[in-house]
Design a protein with these regions (language model features):
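Structural signature of tandem-repeat unit edges
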Residues: 39, 54-76, 86-99, 109-122, ...
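A recurrent domain-boundary module in secreted/ectodomain proteins
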Residues: 611-630
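Bacterial N-terminal signal peptides
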Residues: 9-20
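Short strand-coil-strand connectors
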Residues: 30, 432, 440, 505, ...
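Consensus positions within tandem repeat domains that build extended binding/scaffold surfaces
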Residues: 79-81, 101-106, 124-129, 147-150, ...
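C-terminal outer-membrane/trafficking sorting elements
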Residues: 629-678
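Positively charged n-region of N-terminal signal peptides that target proteins for export
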Residues: 1-8, 678
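Boundary at the C-terminal end of the N-terminal hydrophobic targeting segment
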Residues: 22-26
């Protein structure tokens, strides 16, 4: 046996000392641990209980204890004293208790709190958080401080009586108390902190006292509030304060200068809002998704409306905007689909992106003479608009500003505008520097000096049935004619590029002439052109993009030039009537997966250069087509071998005239050639 050294003994003693101090108590009496909090005042605090010593989870804490012949008053429950003690069900507090520390009863899921001691002055942070058996609570009158999250997630708490004279209800004090139905707010309270009643879904009403000045961020977020009084003393309402409440009406006090972000967002039942003079700012998403709101008068004092402020207010038909308004944020009226008119004030210099996106009810809009910028999709989807006028002040127009404005028949740009024009009364907006047509309509006539047709220029203008593209045009942008009802199109040879999906969804398109200098068929170019029957791909083309002819169900034949080296994913997907493919490339173009998915290969003839049959038969995605040489291409006296596609011999050394009519329907290999029997 080895002899213990002095160093070994020292290590053991240190370990014992450390383990003792980790318990953090001074002494134990009757199974309860205590700390001496003041020797001079002879006070102690409860800091826990001996594991296994409890009496069915019930404790009677004495008012005084005697330790070493000294009498101490028990004045506090220390921090984390009973933290997550699931055995604890009841404690009788002595009147001497003044403080309950942070997380003292946190997570005591079986603890029934009955009465707090009258002498209590302080409740710590998260003191009773997640005590799921507490159903009601009365805060004694002497309490001057309640910590943050004090009763957070007391999910069965239904009523709270605040008898104390506190001035503030701290952050998340009652958050996630989902069954809380009743609580009084003392007249002394000036501030309701952040998230105090967050997710108190059963809380339907509350009375705020006169004198209250501040409602914190998310204070009533996702509560069941249907009504609430708003005293005139309130000066500040935080962001998300009433988010997702069931309020039907609100009168915001004159003392409030700013409505912050998402304050009343997703209040789906809110139908009446009263705003007063003195208000200067309506924040982003302030009334987003208030779907019952039909009309609103914004005070003259308001100078700013934030992004998405009234987005998805789908019943809003009328809104009175003040003359002093200087800024309207992006998407401010996004999908206010029943809004019929709005006057943009003269002080507004920018119309931001998506400001009026999806406002289907707008029939006219006047862009003020001071506006210098119109953001992307600002009026996209305003399907009731019939005319557009651009003032001379406009210096920049971003993409898709008037996309899907289906009823527009007149477009004019002020003649003094230096950046844009509508030359020759073309009923379009043209970028004067680049000669690019950026916005068209059903009545557009493309001028002869136009060099480009911009992306989405005629996007989903369903009343456009024909268009003439002049020889000056060299490029057509992505989805430029998507969703139009043109029936035929002739693209001049000067065009060298046609963008992604340029004729996507042109369901009435039956014929197309592509330019001879085109280098690629871009993805989705003729996707869903369901009435297209045939098309000649120019010899200059080297690639056919993804889904370029997908869903062209009436496409009967296609001719692929010899320079084509690649065919994209699902390029001819669901071309169910395709009966002939002529491919001039001696090497089979590389096809991505499903290039010919749902094409009836058994009934689709593949014509390839002589000598290339075997290469096509061996190539992915080309397998399964039958070649142009049918059985009738052989001499009657020819002796042939017949195999199925798996290489199994079907007939051996048989004369062709004896083979006629004997093979079941299918694809066979006869003397090295793939043959279809139908």
């Amino acid at each position: 046996m080895k002899t213990m050294t002095l160093r070994n003994w020292f290590a053991i003693i240190v370990a014992l000392l450390c383990s003792t101090s980790a318990l953090a108590y001074d002494f134990e009496i009757d199974g309860i641990y205590y700390n001496i909090t003041s020797e001079s005042e002879k006070t102690v605090g409860v800091c826990g209980e001996i594991n296994g010593y409890y009496l069915y989870g019930r404790f009677n804490i004495p008012e005084t204890i005697v330790y070493k012949n000294v009498t101490y008053s028990v004045t506090s429950i220390e921090e984390r004293a009973f933290y997550k003690n699931n055995r604890l069900s009841y404690i009788a507090f002595p009147h001497s208790i003044k403080t309950i520390g942070d997380e003292a009863f946190y997570g005591c899921s079986n603890f029934y709190l009955t009465v707090l001691p009258e002498g209590l002055t302080n409740i710590g942070k998260s003191a009773f958080a997640a005590c799921k058996k507490i159903t009601s609570i009365e805060i004694p009158k002497n309490v001057t401080n309640i910590g943050e999250r004090a009763f957070h997630s007391c999910t069965n708490l239904t009523s709270v009586k605040l008898s104390c004279d506190i001035t503030s209800i701290p952050s998340q004090a009652f958050a996630s108390c989902r069954y809380l139905r009743q609580i009084n707010i003392p007249s002394t309270v000036k501030n309701i902190g952040k998230g105090v009643f967050y997710e108190c879904m059963a809380l339907a009403s509350i009375e705020l006292p006169d004198g209250i000045t501040e409602i914190g961020d998310s204070a009533f977020y996702f509560t069941g509030l249907t009504t609430i009084n708003m005293p005139n003393s309130i000066t500040d309402i935080g962001s998300h304060a009433f988010y997702y409440c069931k309020l039907t009406s609100i009168d915001i006090p004159k003392s409030v200068k700013s409505i912050k972000n998402s304050t009343f967002a997703s209040c789906f039942n809110l139908s009446s809002v009263i705003l007063h003079e003195g208000l200067t700012d309506i924040g982003g998403r302030a009334f987003n998704y208030c779907r019952e709101l039909e009309s609103l008068k914004i005070p003259n004092s308001v100078t700013n409306i934030g992004e998405y402020a009234f987005a998805e207010c789908s019943k809003l038909t009328e809104i009175e905007v003040p003359e002093k308004l200087e800024k309207i944020g992006p998407s401010a009226f996004w999908f206010c689909s029943k809004l019929t008119s709005i006057k943009i004030p003269a002080n507004v210099t920018r119309i931001e992106s998506e400001t009026f996106y999806g406002c289907n009810g707008l029939t006219s809009i006047e862009i003020p003479a001071n506006v210098t910028h119109i953001g992307s999709r600002a009026f996209c989807g305003c399907r009731g608009l019939t005319s557009i006028e651009i003032p001379n002040s406009v210096e920049s127009i971003e993409g898709n500003v008037f996309r899907e404005c289906l009823e527009v028949s007149s477009i004019k740009v002020d003649k003094n505008n230096k950046m844009y024009d509508s030359r020759e009364d073309c009923n379009a907006i043209i970028d004067s520097k680049t000669n690019t047509l950026i916005t068209g309509c059903m009545s557009t006539i493309i001028p002869n000096n136009t060099t480009s047709i911009g992306s989405d220029a005629f996007y989903h203008i369903s009343k456009l049935t024909s268009i003439n593209i002049p020889g000056s045009v060299t490029s057509i942008g992505a989805t430029a004619f998507r969703g139009t009802r043109i029936t035929s199109i002739e693209i001049p040879d000067n065009v060298t590029s046609i963008g992604f999906g340029a004729f996507w969804d042109c369901e009435r398109l039956t014929s197309v002439k592509l330019p001879n200098n085109l280098s690629a068929i871009e993805s989705y170019l003729f996707d869903f052109c369901t009435n297209l029957t045939s098309i000649v791909i120019p010899n200059s083309v080297t690639s056919i993009g993804e889904k370029s002819f997908a869903y062209c169900r009436n496409l009967n034949s296609i001719e692929i030039p010899e320079k084509v080296t690649s065919i994209g994913h699902s390029a001819f997907y669901l071309c169910t009537n395709l009966r002939q493919i002529t491919c001039h490339a001696t090497e089979p173009p590389v096809c991505e997966k499903q290039a010919f998915e749902q094409v009836d290969r058994l009934n689709c003839k593949l014509i390839v250069p002589e000598g290339s049959e075997e290469a096509y038969m061996a190539a992915n995605e080309w397998r399964g087509f039958y070649t142009a040489d049918g059985i009738e291409g052989f001499e009657d006296e020819s002796i042939v071998d017949v195999y199925n596609l798996q290489g199994v011999t079907v007939k051996k050394q048989v004369r062709m005239k004896d083979l006629q009519g004997t093979l079941p329907k299918g694809i066979y290999i006869i003397n090295g050639k793939k043959i279809a029997v139908r």
